[in-house]
Amino acid sequence: MRVGVYPGSFDPITKGHLDLIERAASKFDKVIVAVLININKKGMFSIEERVNLIEKCVAKYNNVEVKSFNGLLIDFVRKEKADVIIKGLRSVTDFEYEFQMALMNRELANEVETVFMVTSPNYSYISSSAIKQVASFNGEIKNFVPKEIVEDLEERIISLRGEG
C-alpha cells in the first residue's frame, strides 16, 4: 500500500492545495493531509478548525485523511507508516527550499521518498498568505479557496475585523 503524507499549515486551505490533494489521491492508495501545529505562529484558524475545514473539502475522497502533527515531519511519516512525502511546487523558489528539506528528510529516514508535484498553472500564484492579505483589504477571495469553506473564511475575516 502506497501512503503519501502532504504536510502544510493550510491556514487556510487553497484551491491549489485541494488540486494537489485530488491529484495525489489518484496516485496513492492513501493520502494523509498533515496539518502542522506551529506554536510560534498565530494562525487565522486554530489547528482544530483547519483540520475541520480541510475535512469539509476532502469528504468525497475515501482515501484521504486529515491529521494534525507537531515535531519533526519525518517522525509523523514513520508513525503513520507512510513511504512518501508529497510536496507541491509553485516556483523555483519553492523548489530550492523543498529540495533542501527533502535532502534533510532523506538523511533522517532514507526509506522515505519525497515526491514533488508541480502546481497546476491556474493555481501557481495562490498562497494562503496572499489570500489573507487580499481578505484583509476586503478583496474577493472566493476564486482562491474551495467553495466548501468560502463562508467560513468570510465569517472569520469579519470577526477578526471586529465587524461581527
UniProtKB/Swiss-Prot annotation:
It comes from the Bacteria. ATP binds at S9, F10, H17, G88, L89, R90, E98, Y123, S124, Y125, I126, S127, S128, S129. It catalyses: (R)-4'-phosphopantetheine + ATP + H(+) = 3'-dephospho-CoA + diphosphate. It is found in: Cytoplasm. Its EC number is 2.7.7.3. CDD domains: PPAT. GO terms for cellular component: cytoplasm. Pathway: Cofactor biosynthesis; coenzyme A biosynthesis; CoA from (R)-pantothenate: step 4/5. SUPFAM superfamilies: Nucleotidylyl transferase. Homohexamer. This is Phosphopantetheine adenylyltransferase. It comes from Clostridium perfringens (strain 13 / Type A). The lineage of its organism: Bacteria, Bacillati, Bacillota, Clostridia, Eubacteriales.
